[in-house]
Amino acid sequence: MAKPLGTTGEFFRRRDEWRKHPMLSNQMRHALPGLGIGVAAFCVYLVGEQIYNKALAPSKSSHHHQEQTAPSH
């Protein structure tokens, strides 16, 4: 037999009812099944692109030309 909850148990049961709400359950995860993996893959792509761009960026010492500014009139 289950023991009656009493006022304290009833208070905590009511307080935690929001956790079982259908909108907060796995419904969103099932609605967008690949979103987490897609976001993670996109972040890896962005980091990889930044590393690639920094590795292939020409250093300032390899450029020997200087920019000429147009004279102001």
Swiss-Prot record:
Transmembrane segments: 31-48
InterPro entries, A to Z: NDUFB3
Localization per Swiss-Prot or TrEMBL: Mitochondrion inner membrane
GO cellular component, one term: extracellular region
Keywords: Electron transport, Membrane, Mitochondrion, Mitochondrion inner membrane, Respiratory chain, Transmembrane, Transmembrane helix, Transport
Primary localization class, coarse: mitochondrion
Record flagged with keyword Mitochondrion: yes
One Pfam family recorded for the sequence: NDUF_B12
GO biological process, alphabetically ordered: electron transport chain; photorespiration
Source taxon at top rank: Eukaryota
Membrane topology summary: Single-pass membrane protein
Function summary: Accessory subunit of the mitochondrial membrane respiratory chain NADH dehydrogenase (Complex I), that is believed not to be involved in catalysis. Complex I functions in the transfer of electrons from NADH to the respiratory chain. The immediate electron acceptor for the enzyme is believed to be ubiquinone.
Family recorded in the similarity comment: Belongs to the complex I NDUFB3 subunit family.
Record note on quaternary structure: Complex I is composed of at least 49 different subunits.
The protein's name in its UniProt record: NADH dehydrogenase [ubiquinone] 1 beta subcomplex subunit 3-B
Organism: Arabidopsis thaliana (Mouse-ear cress)
